[in-house]
Amino acid sequence: MNLMLYHYYDSLFIAFFIIQSIVFVTWICFLIYSIKLIKNVPKLSSSKKSRKNSCSYMVSIILPARNEEKYIRKCLDSLVKQEYSNYEIVVINDCSSDNTSHIIKEYVNKTNCKIISIDTKPRPPAWTGKNWACYQGYLHSHGDLFLFTDADTTHSPSTLSLAVNYLLSENLDSLTAIPKILSNDFLTRITLPILWTFSLARYSALKANDPKTKMGYFFGSFFIIKRNVYEMVGTHKSVKEEIVEDGELGRKVKENGFSLKVIHGENLISAIWARDSSSLWHGLRRLLIPLYKKEIVKTTILVALTFILLLFPFIVLPFSTLTVINGKLGISDLTFLLFTIMSIILLILSSVLQLKYTLFENPLYSLAFPLASSFLFIAFVSSIISSGKKNTIEWSDRKY
């Protein structure tokens, strides 16, 4: 019996050692790649040489809004103060039940800036709400360029002029800026660094910026695109059923051979991705459920990797500690413990890096990594379990 237990313990140790070694190497790669992204992804700033006559291009800012009374004033305040001289703001009230419509009308009446206000009719069955609103905005626009943004996003006065100048100077068809993501609650602050790091595996800005790849995406809070390009990829009508429409539209731009660039805009643009813990939960489901329905095997592997990379080191820490205390396996047990501890340190360092340089939050939030990892894994598993049901995604007071 003792011999059988020893062989079982030995086999378990070898399996755990191999998995932990892979986790250790993976987090080294994540950390190195995160540093590379921070350093090498371009930044939207005034350092780029200004292009003459850039203001000759009319820009239509398309702003869909549904029940945004808490945020839309700040957004509109920032948009009407843009230094760029040739633009209009097309605001679409997407069947709001709060004071959003009233606030929009206030700005139409009190500002000198050209604001076009639209009240959408109820969306057709095949459309998601935001796509329908954006499409209605396009139909009422007059611009050569479109800037799509969200009602909970704010922009520095120079944002539009810098973005247009960058687009034209680089001879791009489209441009999207990474905003400063604002967090309103503790759970969002501890979860976003991990989510941001994990997103590197699928949504690498360096890969999106490589014209040789077909991978592309937009940040819904800020992307600018030429009118003819938007029309040639099919407008929002081509992604009318998509829940994560900004990612799909960006992918279509690259797949159709048009240029796209992802740049840092945190110094100029602020956005709220999750307004509280409830919207964080629904936001994660909004990301994963559509992905699971399209790529079942890949998404299942992703969830399994979430467990292995985030939770496995904490789970095996007691086991690796016991191997050192028992001292039955020689130097390998010490190596196992070292890999486990170093993996946890790398997890925390990756979180610190995102908190400090991407999310601009207190790095001490990284100490809550185990709680955040557990929350993410539960949200992902819940999404897979619910994916076969109807009305499982709740977003902007609608169910899909």
What role is predicted for each listed range?
Residues 1-52, 205, 376:
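N-terminal membrane-anchoring/stem segments of glycan-assembly enzymes
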Residues 57-60, 88:
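Cell-envelope/extracellular polymer assembly enzymes that use nucleotide-activated donors
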Residues 301-390:
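Membrane-embedded multi-pass helical conduit in multi-pass membrane proteins
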